[in-house]
Amino acid sequence: MENDAGEFVDLYCPRKCSASNRIIHAKDHASIQLSIAEVVPATGRMTENTKSYALCGAIRRMGESDDCIVRLTKKDGILTKNF
């Protein structure tokens, strides 16, 4: 689709589930997106960096969302490996 300036724009940019790599469609009202902030361990203050995770409704319906969040944050180094 084109806007008034003649540039091509998308109406909807689909997200992908961070755990299952499925595309989250527009009518998936059970899907969530979490943004976890990085914290400086010495001061306990939040930095400018955040990490976003999107989970589809199918993962949440199966009750696997907490396990997926732990697995993804361990992989990214937010949680320690022995958590």
UniProtKB/Swiss-Prot annotation:
**InterPro entries per UniProt:** Ribosomal_eS21, Ribosomal_eS21_CS, Ribosomal_eS21_sf
- Which one Pfam family would you cite for this protein? Ribosomal_S21e
Q: Which Gene3D superfamilies did the record assign?
A: 3.30.1230.20
First-listed, main subcellular location of the protein, grouped into a coarse class: cytoplasm
* Gene Ontology cellular component annotations, sorted alphabetically: cytosol; ribonucleoprotein complex; ribosome; rough endoplasmic reticulum
Is Ribonucleoprotein given among the entry's keywords?
A: yes
- Membrane spanning segments where? none
One GO BP annotation of this record? translation
Question: Which Gene Ontology molecular-function terms are recorded?
Answer: structural constituent of ribosome
The record's keywords, sorted A to Z, are:
Cytoplasm, Endoplasmic reticulum, Ribonucleoprotein, Ribosomal protein
Name its cellular compartments: Cytoplasm, Cytosol; Cytoplasm; Rough endoplasmic reticulum
Q: Tell me if Membrane is a UniProt keyword of this record.
A: no
- Report the sequence similarity comment from the record: Belongs to the eukaryotic ribosomal protein eS21 family.
Quaternary assembly = Component of the 40S small ribosomal subunit.
Can you say what this protein is called? Answer: Small ribosomal subunit protein eS21
Q: Which gene encodes it?
A: RpS21
